[in-house]
Amino acid sequence: MIRDSSTLQKGQNLRVEVNEVRDRLPQNILEIIKKEPVVELVGYKMVDGNQFGLVVKLTNGDINWFFEKELSEIM
């Protein structure tokens, strides 16, 4: 879980927490993430007026977004 996304930089690699997204993603995207959960941060998205989503690029080149609680930093 990312606690403060303001410290992240575009191009930074993050890990998708598969257990956090299992219920909301289509099966084809879930399979991609299960094989390779590391994604690249490409931007931010306002999602509900007071929360930001993190826009990421998957290993197959697709763009998707996740909440901070669904990602973690790779140290």
Model-inferred region functions:
Residues 1-75:
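Basic/aromatic-rich interaction segments and small domains that mediate binding to polyanionic partners
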